[in-house]
Amino acid sequence: MDPMITGLGVVALMGAAATIAGAAEDLESDVGSQSNPNSQVQLAPQMGHLHRIINKAVSGEPVAYGTWCGIAGSVAYVLMQSMQLPVIMAIAVGAVIAAMVHTTYAVTSHMGRIVSQSQFNQPLFMDMLVQHLGPIAGHGFIVTFCIVGLSYLMTLPIPGFAHPFPLPLLAVLWGITIGAIGSSTGDVHYGAEREYQQYPFGGGIPVAIHGDITTKAELGARNSMDVVHFCAKYGGPLTGFAFGAIVFLSFWNTIVFGITGGIISGLIIVLLLIILNNRLEVFARNRYGPYKEDE
């Protein structure tokens, strides 16, 4: 088979895995209030808003997912090298162990944050905590499985791949990357839209309203399940598309045009994306802008 066709097939598989991982990563951070909006949840009791929202951020998303993916990649690497376990099984076992560590940190982090707010009469809802551990662990498993699988594909002895870095290191680097993408792409669809629905859309989140979050849902008190359900419609898929496009475009041009041609085509793609992003933002601001009351 033509090496270029094989390489493009691997790149397509990597792009698909990256798309799934990106969507799951954003939704996991939404259900657990990790990344920028978590500070707003933490400030809510001080603003007089007692809530039933998970607040588990032990760190920023890049550091957290670098850790989870590094754990999964290291376990998978050891199982493949020492026990000759099949690739899929080794990656799955690594992702399970990473999900267990992830869940442990989620519990301790949430409890620690909530207890620190007890002076503002914020209670610890155990039922809410237990109900949200499944989505946190499940989304985290999907992310680590896809990222470690993507990293493994980079090590295959195929022209354009055969990366010299070992699997655990690649998993850490891609974990940091997906954490950064999820933090920068998906945040606005949680913090600005769902958490501050009582404020006009398009006006940003000034410091004066930090912590003044929405605590009532369509029926009853709002919880993180409501948030992740909302974000699954747009924020999650958009984050997955962004990360999948980054992975695909990063490898596709090198496979097709070679190293020098890939660098040139990559610069052209980046320039086109900058122009497209500017035109899209200007159009959106001019067309929609902030919400205005009827006169």
Swiss-Prot record:
TM segments? 4-24, 60-80, 87-107, 140-160, 161-181, 234-254, 255-275
Superkingdom, natural source: Archaea
Q: Name one GO molecular function term.
A: tetrahydromethanopterin S-methyltransferase activity
- Residue runs in coiled coils: none
Q: How does it sit in the membrane?
A: Multi-pass membrane protein
Q: Does the keyword Transferase apply?
A: yes
Which reactions does this protein catalyse? 5-methyl-5,6,7,8-tetrahydromethanopterin + coenzyme M + 2 Na(+)(in) = 5,6,7,8-tetrahydromethanopterin + methyl-coenzyme M + 2 Na(+)(out)
Keyword list, A-Z: Cell membrane, Membrane, Methanogenesis, Methyltransferase, One-carbon metabolism, Transferase, Translocase, Transmembrane, Transmembrane helix
Show the Pfam families listed in the entry: MtrE
Localization (cell): Cell membrane
The pathway this protein participates in, as annotated, is: One-carbon metabolism; methanogenesis from CO(2); methyl-coenzyme M from 5,10-methylene-5,6,7,8-tetrahydromethanopterin: step 2/2
Q: What class of enzyme is it?
A: translocase
Major place of residence? membrane
Q: Give a yes or no for keyword Thylakoid in this entry.
A: no
* UniProt record similarity statement: Belongs to the MtrE family.
The subunit field of the Swiss-Prot or TrEMBL record says: The complex is composed of 8 subunits; MtrA, MtrB, MtrC, MtrD, MtrE, MtrF, MtrG and MtrH.
Q: What is this protein called?
A: Tetrahydromethanopterin S-methyltransferase subunit E
